[in-house]
UniProtKB/Swiss-Prot annotation:
Gene3D superfamilies in alphabetical order: Tubby Protein, Chain A
GO cellular component: ciliary membrane; cytoplasm; nucleus; rhabdomere
One GO BP: protein localization to cilium
PANTHER family from the UniProt entry: PROTEIN KING TUBBY (PTHR16517:SF7), TUBBY-RELATED (PTHR16517)
Source species of the chain: Drosophila pseudoobscura pseudoobscura
Topological category with respect to the lipid bilayer: Peripheral membrane protein
Gene that encodes the chain: king-tubby
Keyword DNA-binding: no
Protein name: Protein king tubby
Family: Belongs to the TUB family.
Region (Disordered): 111-202
Amino acid sequence: MCKLPFSKSRMRQLMEAYIRQKRASPGMVQASDLQISRPMSGMRSNSRELHAYDGPMQFISSPLNPDQILTNGSPVGGTVAMNSTRNHSNNMRTLSTISQEADLIEEISSHELEDEESSPVTVIEQQQTAPHSANSTHSQRPSTTRQPSFNDTLDEDDYTNRNIAGAAPVRPVGLASSPYKEAGLDGSSMETSNGAGGESEGDVIGNIDQFVMQPAPQGVLYKCRITRDRKGMDRGLFPIYYLHLERDYGKKIFLLGGRKRKKSKTSNYIVSCDPTDLSRSADGFCGKLRSNVFGTSFTVFDSGNKDSTDSPRLDLAVIIYDTNILGFKGPRNMTVILPGMTEDDQRVKISSADPKQTGILDLYKMKNMDNIVELHNKTPVWNDETQSYVLNFHGRVTQASVKNFQLVHDSDPEYIVMQFGRTSEDVFTMDYRYPLCAMQAFAIALSSFDGKIACE
């Protein structure tokens, strides 16, 4: 591959001359009222002047020639001889350059010049000397900054009994990311949590065992934190999860604790408001979470007895994860079915243990939506820069995980009923609002920790 003896700017000038000559030839049709401008092109125009050092040919006849060698205290004869030698060499260089221009026109016409510049050239104000302008061109070149990307952090249980290659982690996106605001992921409803829309942060009212079962009041957001304890002999496979309500100045209030039962054919979690006794027979027992064999469907029950007729066990929620047997890559798709709400903001009592009633899951399968509410996870947006799916958690989630999700209703996708995501290896944030209660939200979060054979 031959090396052209001209600078890139000179080659562009020759290419422009060739294009003008070709456009003037018959057979070319061009618009008479359309002026095509290429702001990203590196070609020069008559209305733009670049102040930059462009090689020795640009300053041959200029008194400010940066290549000129000046000597102090030299004899007059020696100076004249040096200038004569320099002028002779410059003239020879000019003659050889002019003789090659005609040959280069045909060579350039068969090759398309590639514009190596990716940003428009900025005109730099001319300084006292030309070399100083050249240095300013390099020092004042605009720099582009890249948004920091989060490393994909996966739990040990993400690799247990599942095909993790089929699941993609969801990353949190910063507040200043305008592409996601255009996509409708600005999460305007979560801005009200800071007090802008009149929504206040919730606090515990009354006893803990009653508070965790009470639906959140409208206009109140509860910010919680889940910690996972995997210390001990068997907590690597059966960790304990603790739910705390976040308060100001780093304070927190314990709400619920949950653990997975060891001797159970399917995943079965016990939830209690007593952190010292996480058993079904404990006084603080609040309910349980049970899954099917494949881990695709979870049902949340309260502390009632399924064999009792006076106070039968009630269905609090059903979580359904879409199956992914073929292994398509993408985030989790989940559907949450809740009991409907009455006019006084109380849950409709639905019991699958009562033979006279139909459970939440059966109502959903029958498409009987009169007394149930259907929620879905908010669809993340694919980011080409980070090659990942992203959601706007407004600073509440800081690490990527397949567990990160937001629950919304189809009628109002900007009203985030619940969001859950990771902040460190064993710490997760969980925020919920009306119509969820702490027990329902905590059970939904526990279902995301459980291994799912057919979902990923």
